[in-house]
């Protein structure tokens, strides 16, 4: 995939995303349904002087799950400790993290679906009853130690909710699905980022960037950064529609946010298989990508935008894809 359209964070994104991160719900653009629900749950928990139920945030990468976790902590007025599933390799790692929590704190675990099962099992009692039992020593000299924990809120984030075990999923009192962003919300995000970067965006350039951002704020901010470079070198420093079109064309991002590989998938299906149906394995071989990459990186957006559909027989290209790429659509094919 064109790196600029990759929803996973790149090294350059980390510092930028932290500087752009909203602190409270009233600064957070988009995800209105999720925000409305969480605001109610947080207010109710604070009124009862209880900790907020554990929260699961799930959805595609780049949609602001980490940002939402920090907003939750700020709205609760508590500290947040951040880690990731792959970083918690053994139960002792989890115990060390839990032992540092203060009453009411938020523990944020990104990529929670990647925790080892032995770690996950320790987490069950911590989430449900705020205690853990740990084994010290080995063999005949081993003994179990009961450790009470302060009440806390676990916020877990995942792009693969289906990979969570049923026992773990059942312990989250709140599950929030983060969805792709509407263009109007992405436009506001681009404008907000431009203000922070002190870049002037004019002539509907923000709309154009939003339309090509694959419904993802991370990509919108990344595109703005790159267009800003073009505006600085090839223009007067202002980001207008003309320089935006030119920059994104050079970057191989078309009007619908499709990159070279997206188009290659659709063109291969149209030219070699008359639009399908075609099996995902066969398609992956034809475009020289592995099956998992096609399924995880490309297919969801193509389906979401109405360019591709799944059938029992395989994947099929839609009439919209034909028209977008300039092919004549024959309904009988």
Curated annotation (Swiss-Prot):
GO terms for biological process: DNA recombination; DNA repair. Pfam families: AAA_lid_4, RuvB_C, RuvB_N. Residues 255-333 are annotated as: Head domain (RuvB-H). Keywords: ATP-binding, Cytoplasm, DNA damage, DNA recombination, DNA repair, DNA-binding, Hydrolase, Nucleotide-binding. Disulfide bonds: none annotated. Its EC number is 3.6.4.-. CDD domains: AAA (cd00009). GO terms for molecular function: ATP binding; ATP hydrolysis activity; four-way junction DNA binding; four-way junction helicase activity. InterPro entries: AAA+_ATPase, AAA_lid_4, DNA_helicase_Holl-junc_RuvB, P-loop_NTPase, RuvB-like_N, RuvB_C, WH-like_DNA-bd_sf, WH_DNA-bd_sf. Gene3D superfamilies: 1.10.8.60, P-loop containing nucleotide triphosphate hydrolases, Winged helix-like DNA-binding domain superfamily/Winged helix DNA-binding domain. It catalyses: ATP + H2O = ADP + phosphate + H(+). Mg(2+) binds at residue 66. Residues 182-252 are annotated as: Small ATPAse domain (RuvB-S). Belongs to the RuvB family. The RuvA-RuvB-RuvC complex processes Holliday junction (HJ) DNA during genetic recombination and DNA repair, while the RuvA-RuvB complex plays an important role in the rescue of blocked DNA replication forks via replication fork reversal (RFR). RuvA specifically binds to HJ cruciform DNA, conferring on it an open structure. The RuvB hexamer acts as an ATP-dependent pump, pulling dsDNA into and through the RuvAB complex. RuvB forms 2 homohexamers on either side of HJ DNA bound by 1 or 2 RuvA tetramers; 4 subunits per hexamer contact DNA at a time. PANTHER family: HOLLIDAY JUNCTION BRANCH MIGRATION COMPLEX SUBUNIT RUVB, PTHR42848. This is Holliday junction branch migration complex subunit RuvB.
């Amino acid at each position: 995939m064109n790196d600029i359209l990759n929803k996973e964070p790149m090294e350059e994104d980390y510092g930028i995303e932290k500087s752009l991160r909203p602190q409270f719900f009233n600064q957070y653009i988009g995800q209105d349904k999720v925000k409305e629900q969480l605001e109610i749950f947080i207010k109710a928990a604070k009124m009862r002087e209880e900790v907020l139920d554990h929260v699961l945030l799930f959805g595609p990468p780049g949609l602001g799950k980490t940002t939402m976790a920090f907003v939750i902590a700020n709205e609760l007025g508590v500290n947040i400790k951040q880690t990731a599933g792959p970083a918690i390799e053994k139960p002792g790692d989890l115990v060390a993290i839990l032992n540092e929590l203060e009453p009411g704190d938020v523990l944020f675990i990104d990529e929670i679906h990647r925790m080892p099962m032995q770690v996950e099992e320790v987490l069950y009692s911590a989430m449900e009853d705020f205690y853990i039992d740990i084994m010290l020593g080995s063999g005949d000299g081993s003994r179990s130690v009961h450790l009470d924990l302060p009440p806390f809120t676990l916020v877990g984030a995942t792009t693969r909710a289906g990979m969570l075990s049923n026992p773990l999923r059942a312990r989250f009192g709140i599950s929030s699905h983060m969805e792709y962003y509407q263009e109007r919300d992405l436009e506001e995000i681009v404008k907000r980022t431009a203000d922070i970067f002190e870049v002037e965006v004019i002539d509907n350039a923000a709309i154009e960037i939003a339309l090509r951002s694959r419904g993802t704020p991370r990509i919108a901010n990344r595109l703005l950064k790159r267009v800003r470079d073009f505006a600085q070198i090839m223009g007067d420093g202002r980001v207008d529609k003309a320089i935006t079109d030119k920059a994104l064309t050079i970057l191989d991002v078309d009007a619908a946010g499709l990159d070279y590989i997206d188009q290659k998938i659709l063109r291969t299906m149209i030219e070699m298989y008359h639009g399908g149906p075609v099996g995902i394995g066969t398609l992956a071989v034809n475009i020289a990508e592995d099956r998992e990459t096609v399924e995880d990186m490309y297919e969801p957006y193509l389906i979401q935008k109405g360019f591709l559909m799944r059938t029992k027989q395989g994947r099929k290209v839609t009439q919209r894809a034909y028209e977008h790429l300039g092919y004549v659509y024959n309904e009988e094919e």
